């Protein structure tokens, strides 16, 4: 009852289109959710992502939640997640994808959900790691432990958003360490 009154005077709005959210909607309205270009890689063993990494790394499974298009809805939401402090977007995406991934047999043997870490300087600037809530939501839905200490960023690299896929791979190989203790 009280939450209904709060919503009446301070309605929540969609992170994508800014329209008011209905009571059952969380962060993103139904209309915008249906516009998101879902990749459905988790139902295809041989998909775009797996082919992109073929011959570069040993990959047993690869999937992505959405297709990314420049100036598209996904880019806008990721920008708000990373730079505008809307961490709830990550949690919602993680919950949606966690539900989808429950049907993937190979993930039942996964040891951890591991987020890509930020360097301490960038973490202080942003205030949080934008993939933390995504990873925690995946972890909860898949019942796989969340581990944010095993992968460590050694260097504070410049933003890679304008670099090619292959250049990002080169940079990443020397940027991270694994700590097993």
Regions found by a protein language model. Name each.
Residues 1-181:
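Glycine-rich phosphate/pyrophosphate-handling loop used in enzymes and phosphotransfer proteins
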């Amino acid at each position: 009852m009280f939450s209904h009154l709060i919503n009446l005077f301070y309605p929540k709005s969609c992170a994508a289109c800014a329209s008011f959210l209905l009571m059952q909607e969380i962060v993103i309205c139904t209309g915008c959710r249906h516009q998101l270009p879902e990749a459905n890689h988790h139902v295809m063993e041989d998909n775009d992502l797996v082919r992109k990494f073929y011959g570069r790394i040993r990959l047993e499974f690869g999937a992505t939640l959405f297709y990314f298009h420049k100036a598209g809805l996904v880019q806008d939401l990721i920008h708000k997640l990373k730079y505008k402090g809307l961490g709830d977007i990550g949690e919602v995406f993680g919950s949606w994808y966690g539900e989808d991934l429950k049907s993937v047999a190979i993930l039942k043997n996964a040891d951890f959900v591991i987020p890509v870490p930020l360097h301490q300087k960038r973490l202080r600037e942003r205030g949080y790691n934008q993939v933390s809530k995504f990873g925690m939501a995946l972890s909860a839905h898949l019942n796989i432990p969340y581990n944010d200490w095993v992968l460590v960023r050694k260097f504070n690299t410049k933003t890679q958003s304008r670099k090619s896929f292959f250049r990002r791979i080169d940079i990443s190989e020397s940027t991270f360490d694994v700590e097993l203790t």
